[in-house]
Amino acid sequence: MVSIRPDEISSILKQQIADYDKSVSVSNVGTVLQIGDGIARVYGLEKVMAGELVEFEDGTEGIALNLEDDNVGVVLMGEALGVQEGSTVKATGKIASVPVGEAMLGRVVNPLGQQIDGKGEMATTDSRLIESIAPGIIKRKSVHEPMQTGITSIDAMIPIGRGQRELIIGDRQTGKTAIAIDTIINQKGQDVICVYVAVGQKQASVANVVEVLKEKGALDYTIIVNAGASEAAALQYLAPYTGAAIAEHFMYQGKATLVIYDDLTKQAQAYRQMSLLLRRPPGREAYPGDVFYCHSRLLERAAKLSDAMGAGSMTSLPIIETQAGDVSAYIPTNVISITDGQIFLSSDLFNSGLRPAINVGISVSRVGGAAQTKAIKKIAGTLKLELAQFDELAAFSQFASDLDEATQKQLGRGKRLRELLKQPQFDPLNLAEQVAIVYAGVKGLIDEVPEEEVVKFARELRDYLKTNKAEFLKNVLSEKVLSEASESMLKDAISEVKSSMLAA
């Protein structure tokens, strides 16, 4: 018979007691009562926070948006095919956050900051809350540096400054995204980090944008956040906030950033869908009462920070799609009232061949004038007025049979100015080229050039300046003013190009 040794037993017990870990893990859990249409009603989760991330049994994440007496309304961020009635839900104790940092440059991510471009994981250690409070008055500085878009009509007449919020608004297929992409391409070499947020877009359209940016060498300083049309409404709603959080990280490091939200109409529709399914009371056009706050808290995060805060900036270009040019609808009027100006694109102008199809008469920039460079401000001062007068005269001349010489001359100049401002897609102009083109039109130096030859003249003038007057381009780009020496060089170039064209 085996003898029992008490000392052995006591040593084993002592060892077990020494190894015993009495830490207790407490989880805040609940049970799914009802699920459907991307919304789950959950019983339990007593200590859940508003906006807290929750995790379902199958790993799907959701956000607790409605905290009611007897249940919690959770919006799902995914298909959640494995979630059913009775499934367990666990509160994570975390608010939605996104990875940020230099490693994200050139990458395509989803609204949760996870890579979706197949290039492998991103080596980021920093993260930032998706929702954060906008900088206060003391932390800000007035907008005073230009954000060149490379589009002559915008930089000359509707200038944008770093830290501004400028709305791009127009019907579908009027070139809204093209303006945004041109602006990103034009930031090459300007030390600006760009974030392009695609909300509810076709995957093919986003792939095309990525391809264009890669081709133009602009993907190296751009981050793309994509919540496609097939994604859950919660992800489409979150995408703009994710883009803002990624840009904010760089802004607080003292860098200049540019964020494009393409487009906020689809974000508002996703938010409306979520709110109605959560049984929140509908308001105008069935949008919830806080849809204004949804956009204002996003766009207020754009800022030009004070020197004490590092002097970084975040410029926002939100895009809104209108129906049949109706800017008095609910979402367009909301966003117009939040932003510092709007660029209005007209389908009539687009179809008549004027591209970019900017309606200069009703487009404004409320703070950009202070940021405009002296070189273009000096010569473009009368441009907007001349085009407005031309539009009036053109409308009037349809009914008049014979026009006096002065009116005919004014109409001719207006038509040539219109032609000068035409610009091909993905071909932004630098400041010096814009100065040259606007100068030629405003000073009446191309009044003899036939109307149909004006676009060709602008192209040839750019080529001539690059090959024969490189000093002019260098001077204007470095000094940001049009000096007398530069002006005489420009006059020579214009007369040279004009005479060679007219001789031909």
Curated annotation (Swiss-Prot):
<dbReference type="InterPro" id="IPR038376">
    <property type="entry name" value="ATP_synth_asu_C_sf"/>
</dbReference>
<protein>
    <recommendedName>
        <fullName>ATP synthase subunit alpha</fullName>
        <ecNumber>7.1.2.2</ecNumber>
    </recommendedName>
</protein>
<dbReference type="GO" id="GO:0031676">
    <property type="term" value="C:plasma membrane-derived thylakoid membrane"/>
</dbReference>
<keyword id="KW-0067">ATP-binding</keyword>
<dbReference type="GO" id="GO:0005524">
    <property type="term" value="F:ATP binding"/>
</dbReference>
<keyword id="KW-0793">Thylakoid</keyword>
<dbReference type="InterPro" id="IPR005294">
    <property type="entry name" value="ATP_synth_F1_asu"/>
</dbReference>
<dbReference type="GO" id="GO:0045259">
    <property type="term" value="C:proton-transporting ATP synthase complex"/>
</dbReference>
<comment type="similarity">
    <text>Belongs to the ATPase alpha/beta chains family.</text>
</comment>
<dbReference type="Pfam" id="PF02874">
    <property type="entry name" value="ATP-synt_ab_N"/>
</dbReference>
<dbReference type="GO" id="GO:0043531">
    <property type="term" value="F:ADP binding"/>
</dbReference>
<dbReference type="InterPro" id="IPR027417">
    <property type="entry name" value="P-loop_NTPase"/>
</dbReference>
<keyword id="KW-0813">Transport</keyword>
<dbReference type="InterPro" id="IPR020003">
    <property type="entry name" value="ATPase_a/bsu_AS"/>
</dbReference>
<keyword id="KW-0066">ATP synthesis</keyword>
<dbReference type="InterPro" id="IPR036121">
    <property type="entry name" value="ATPase_F1/V1/A1_a/bsu_N_sf"/>
</dbReference>
<keyword id="KW-0139">CF(1)</keyword>
<dbReference type="InterPro" id="IPR000793">
    <property type="entry name" value="ATP_synth_asu_C"/>
</dbReference>
<keyword id="KW-1278">Translocase</keyword>
<keyword id="KW-0472">Membrane</keyword>
<feature type="site" description="Required for activity">
    <location>
        <position position="363"/>
    </location>
</feature>
<dbReference type="GO" id="GO:0046933">
    <property type="term" value="F:proton-transporting ATP synthase activity, rotational mechanism"/>
</dbReference>
<comment type="function">
    <text>Produces ATP from ADP in the presence of a proton gradient across the membrane. The alpha chain is a regulatory subunit.</text>
</comment>
<dbReference type="Pfam" id="PF00006">
    <property type="entry name" value="ATP-synt_ab"/>
</dbReference>
<comment type="subunit">
    <text>F-type ATPases have 2 components, CF(1) - the catalytic core - and CF(0) - the membrane proton channel. CF(1) has five subunits: alpha(3), beta(3), gamma(1), delta(1), epsilon(1). CF(0) has four main subunits: a(1), b(1), b'(1) and c(9-12).</text>
</comment>
<dbReference type="Pfam" id="PF00306">
    <property type="entry name" value="ATP-synt_ab_C"/>
</dbReference>
<keyword id="KW-0406">Ion transport</keyword>
<dbReference type="InterPro" id="IPR023366">
    <property type="entry name" value="ATP_synth_asu-like_sf"/>
</dbReference>
<dbReference type="InterPro" id="IPR000194">
    <property type="entry name" value="ATPase_F1/V1/A1_a/bsu_nucl-bd"/>
</dbReference>
<keyword id="KW-0547">Nucleotide-binding</keyword>
<keyword id="KW-0375">Hydrogen ion transport</keyword>
<dbReference type="InterPro" id="IPR033732">
    <property type="entry name" value="ATP_synth_F1_a_nt-bd_dom"/>
</dbReference>
<dbReference type="InterPro" id="IPR004100">
    <property type="entry name" value="ATPase_F1/V1/A1_a/bsu_N"/>
</dbReference>
<feature type="binding site">
    <location>
        <begin position="170"/>
        <end position="177"/>
    </location>
    <ligand>
        <name>ATP</name>
    </ligand>
</feature>
